[in-house]
Amino acid sequence: MEMTSAFTLNVRLDNIAIITIDVPGEKMNTLKAEFASQVRAIIKQLRENKELRGVVFVSAKPDNFIAGADINMIGNCKTAQEAEALARQGQQLMAEIHALPIPVIAAIHGACLGGGLELALACHGRVCTDDPKTVLGLPEVQLGLLPGSGGTQRLPRLIGVSTALEMILTGKQLRAKQALKLGLVDDVVPHSILLEAAVELAKKDRPSSRPLPVRERILAGPLGRAQLFKMVGKKTEHKTQGNYPATERILEVVETGLAQGTSSGYDAEARAFGELAMTPQSQALRSIFFASTEVKKDPGSDAPPAPLNSVGILGGGLMGGGIAYVTACKAGIPVRIKDINPQGINHALKYSWDQLEGKVRRRHLKASERDKQLALISGTTDYRGFAHRDLIIEAVFENLELKQQMVAEVEQNCAAHTIFASNTSSLPIGDIAAHATRPEQVIGLHFFSPVEKMPLVEIIPHAGTSAQTIATTVKLAKKQGKTPIVVRDKAGFYVNRILAPYINEAIRMLTEGERVAHIDAALVKFGFPVGPIQLLDEVGIDTGTKIIPVLEAAYGERFSAPANVVSSILNDDRKGRKNGRGFYLYGQKGRKSKKQVDPAIYPLIGAQGQGRLSAPQVAERCVMLMLNEAVRCVDEQVIRSVRDGDIGAVFGIGFPPFLGGPFRYIDSLGAGEVVAIMQRLATQYGSRFTPCERLVEMGARGESFWKTTATDLQ
């Protein structure tokens, strides 16, 4: 049976051809190699019809134009030559669209990304809607690739080289007004008149490209270009630490096109695309993309979720305020905050106001929309307005008795169906539910700080939590824009459990004489966004170290921090950035002064600050402990799958995405090699480096996680 075409042609009475993009059976339009023949057949018809005045590409999907190329096509390529051929096919198709003798216009509503934007760039003009769903960008770099269907050549010529480089190197997505200002689109209109506006543009002569700003014209010349590429190259190298080969190739390919002409540029683009597709970095980044897509589709349990019409939050602190913001402003669910004093409520409301006001100032949000979202948040010092809340999120202090009291109060003041979700980072959910009359409705919902930025949440059912409670909590997390992983109710859950030994080892190296800046720089070079010492300062030394005794009590000596170091730091009133002094010193609040290591930290912890380890040796010690603990978490079924383990580490603590997560990284090294490294470290530094049994067995058998393990390990 022949597949329904993804591209269909209709010619209007006014001789404007409408090409409708609608990939059958899919929510999103993505470009596949097999569509090329469909488009070519349409192009042939267009060329044969001499009456035509213009062409409009439009999507039939309600919220996307084209979300990009189908990434599975790249995975199916076995060699760089195959991937290069794929790019050349895309380039050729775009060239044929561009070569049509009549105006071709892209009518864009919703996501126009990757290959979708490359198709729009091949058109002679672009009109998009003013809807917040409409975004334009080339995110291929986030998959370790570059745009392979002409994007590296067309975009710089349309909007200028410096702006184009920023878009391609970062994967930055533009909203409609930004795209108009930069000349990426010719008009922005309401959704209701998109097609007619595009048709009107198609009836005119081909839109002439707007002259580039003077700055961009200077940068396009040989001298300006040389300076620009030198400066951007240096900045990019600093940002990526040389871990992402795609950025280097993007610079090379764009410069080739500008210096040697588009023919050389297209050739370089296709070659680079093919080579990058075969790199381990791209394979790892694509695995993270697929894994996160799967996690977002995972309902958490087989039971249907309960309705979520309103949510309550206990505690108006930093976490409570952040949770209120993502619940009201991302999920669109009415929120009521309870705090013991009005200042807490005001603090939480101000948090949402500040976030939304920032969007208004940046013109990402209308003031009326801000007010509408803020109206979803209310506050109280008692339980008025809580009687019919579907789910309550508790964000009070880390105190077991207090949290148990919150459970009792919620059961007394809320409905029989109300779910109680605790935002604890360390207390067992089973203990919090110990005295509950409805323990099946108690669950853990662990957010990471800052709530509005961190993409991960851990959902922690205890032994008695019902399947529906799990499904409902997963549903809420997704509505809040989060990626949820369901983890077992064991001390530290997953993320904090693998993070603690990593940070402990960094502190231990400090006591051995390694310098703060050297340790942090070593882990940034390895690929983490910040080093472990800086991370502790950012989280708050008091907050970040609170979990160490809990983990040591549960799992033994391997979780012990160096004796007296943490207490010495805390006794000296060092909490990190929040009070201006930790391992680093910070300038006054509100001022962007550079942080600097406080030299007083070394005598305080009894260290000399004269290290002997190289950066790779520092990174090895921290990372190996994290890998070992991650494997234990699989073994103890703390995580449901290695997929969840990789996503949890990348999204929860910034494990280097180009390595694919702890389990992909172990696979790339080989379990046997990891065991050998850990045994060497155990001989040098002690038994905490002893590889766990599962790793030793896998190493002996030559097994790997991703090739031998199903996605669900249960």
UniProtKB/Swiss-Prot annotation:
Q: So, what pathway does this thing act in? A: Lipid metabolism; fatty acid beta-oxidation
Q: Look up keyword Ribosomal protein and say if it applies.
A: no
Q: Where in the cell is it found?
A: Cytoplasm
A GO molecular function for this record?
long-chain-3-hydroxyacyl-CoA dehydrogenase activity
Site annotation Important for catalytic activity: residues: 118, 140
- Quote the cellular component terms of the Gene Ontology held in the record: cytoplasm
The EC code for this enzyme is 4.2.1.17, 5.1.2.3, 1.1.1.35
The reply on keyword Cytoplasm is: yes
Q: Where is this region: 3-hydroxyacyl-CoA dehydrogenase?
A: 306-714
What does the record give as the reaction this protein catalyses? Answer: a (3S)-3-hydroxyacyl-CoA = a (2E)-enoyl-CoA + H2O; a 4-saturated-(3S)-3-hydroxyacyl-CoA = a (3E)-enoyl-CoA + H2O; a (3S)-3-hydroxyacyl-CoA + NAD(+) = a 3-oxoacyl-CoA + NADH + H(+); (3S)-3-hydroxybutanoyl-CoA = (3R)-3-hydroxybutanoyl-CoA
InterPro entries found in the cross-reference section: 3-OHacyl-CoA_DH_CS (IPR006180), 3-OHacyl-CoA_DH_NAD-bd (IPR006176), 3HC_DH_C (IPR006108), 6-PGluconate_DH-like_C_sf (IPR008927), ClpP/crotonase-like_dom_sf (IPR029045), Enoyl-CoA_hydra/iso (IPR001753), FA_oxidation_alpha_subunit (IPR050136), FadJ (IPR012802)
The segments labelled Enoyl-CoA hydratase in the record are 1-190
- Which terms under GO biological process does the entry name? fatty acid beta-oxidation
**Domain of life the protein comes from:** Bacteria
Q: Which purpose does this protein serve, as stated in its record?
A: Catalyzes the formation of a hydroxyacyl-CoA by addition of water on enoyl-CoA. Also exhibits 3-hydroxyacyl-CoA epimerase and 3-hydroxyacyl-CoA dehydrogenase activities.
* Subunit structure of this chain's protein: Heterotetramer of two alpha chains (FadJ) and two beta chains (FadI).
Q: What family classification does the UniProt entry report for this protein?
A: In the N-terminal section; belongs to the enoyl-CoA hydratase/isomerase family.
Q: What is this protein called?
A: Fatty acid oxidation complex subunit alpha
Tell me which species this is from: Escherichia coli O157:H7
Q: Which gene encodes it?
A: fadJ
